[in-house]
Swiss-Prot record:
<keyword id="KW-0812">Transmembrane</keyword>
<dbReference type="Pfam" id="PF00957">
    <property type="entry name" value="Synaptobrevin"/>
</dbReference>
<dbReference type="InterPro" id="IPR010908">
    <property type="entry name" value="Longin_dom"/>
</dbReference>
<dbReference type="GO" id="GO:0005768">
    <property type="term" value="C:endosome"/>
</dbReference>
<dbReference type="GO" id="GO:0033263">
    <property type="term" value="C:CORVET complex"/>
</dbReference>
<dbReference type="GO" id="GO:0031201">
    <property type="term" value="C:SNARE complex"/>
</dbReference>
<dbReference type="InterPro" id="IPR011012">
    <property type="entry name" value="Longin-like_dom_sf"/>
</dbReference>
<feature type="transmembrane region" description="Helical; Anchor for type IV membrane protein">
    <location>
        <begin position="216"/>
        <end position="236"/>
    </location>
</feature>
<feature type="topological domain" description="Vesicular">
    <location>
        <begin position="237"/>
        <end position="240"/>
    </location>
</feature>
<keyword id="KW-0967">Endosome</keyword>
<dbReference type="GO" id="GO:0031901">
    <property type="term" value="C:early endosome membrane"/>
</dbReference>
<comment type="similarity">
    <text>Belongs to the synaptobrevin family.</text>
</comment>
<keyword id="KW-0813">Transport</keyword>
<protein>
    <recommendedName>
        <fullName>Vesicle-associated membrane protein 727</fullName>
    </recommendedName>
</protein>
<keyword id="KW-0653">Protein transport</keyword>
<dbReference type="GO" id="GO:0016192">
    <property type="term" value="P:vesicle-mediated transport"/>
</dbReference>
<keyword id="KW-1133">Transmembrane helix</keyword>
Length: 240
């Protein structure tokens, strides 16, 4: 990762930027706000590309987390950063976010569930959480190997989810219905139960055969001892 990997970050509620940080100068914030106002509503993750930079957005429960990154950084690492910021933000302010009390930043239509009394205007949160954004950016920049491993892990998880969905779609594309899949499952369960019953019967049969063999051996040994005793002692008249 280059030293200029992560450039600018903010947290917004709706279209209102609540906290931001950047160690660089530029018009990143202006472009980011323009992108924010045009975010699609059907996706929780979105990336715009502009002049060798990516504007990466993560949307969660009405809150928008953004990071501007150098295009060479890729998409995985910026979203690992955004997940870290989101979890930290929720951990710090979840109680206030769930508060039903109206907040000065609330929009007319959709911002009913906002913050409590902890901060009354946007710059209070910027002053409080802006330095946290800085810490996360510095940490991610100084731990590229960890970020790379996390991004690969998330990519693998996403790939597995895609494979599972792909497999289901392939089954359905072949014309097999869910009912048939259920029937197959029930049939497999019946076969498993039948196999268990056969296994128990086989073990019982083997146990009986083993017991029979032991009784035969014991009878033979007893008969041999009895014959030796009769020969040696002359039947039942053996004297000391």
């Amino acid at each position: 990762m280059s030293q200029k990997g992560l450039i600018y970050s903010f947290v917004a509620k709706g279209t209102v930027v609540l906290a931001e940080h950047t160690p660089y100068s530029g018009n990143f914030s202006t472009i980011a706000v323009q992108c924010l106002q045009k975010l699609p509503t059907n996706s929780s993750k979105y990336t715009y590309s502009c002049d060798g930079h990516t504007f990466n957005f993560l949307v969660d429960n009405g809150f928008v987390f953004l990071v501007v990154a150098d295009e060479s950084t890729g998409r995985s690492v910026p979203f690992v950063f955004l997940e870290r910021v989101k979890e930290d933000f929720k951990k710090r302010y979840e109680a206030s976010i769930k508060n039903d009390e109206r907040h000065p930043l609330a929009d007319e239509d959709e911002d009913d569930d906002l913050f409590g009394d902890r901060f009354s205007v946007a710059y209070n949160l910027d002053r409080e959480f802006g330095p946290i954004l800085k810490e996360h950016m510095q940490y991610c920049m100084s731990h590229p190997e960890e970020m790379s491993k996390l991004s690969k892990l998330k990519a693998q998880i996403t790939e597995v989810k895609g494979i599972m969905m792909d497999n289901i779609e392939k089954v359905l594309d072949r014309g097999e219905k869910i009912e048939l899949l259920v029937d197959k499952t029930e049939n497999l369960q019946f076969q498993a139960d039948s196999f268990q019953r056969q296994g128990r019967q086989l073990r019982r049969k083997m146990w009986l055969q083993s017991l029979q063999m032991k009784l035969m051996v014991a009878g033979a040994v007893f008969s041999f001892i009895l014959i030796v005793w009769v020969v040696a002692c002359g039947g039942f008249k053996c004297s000391s």
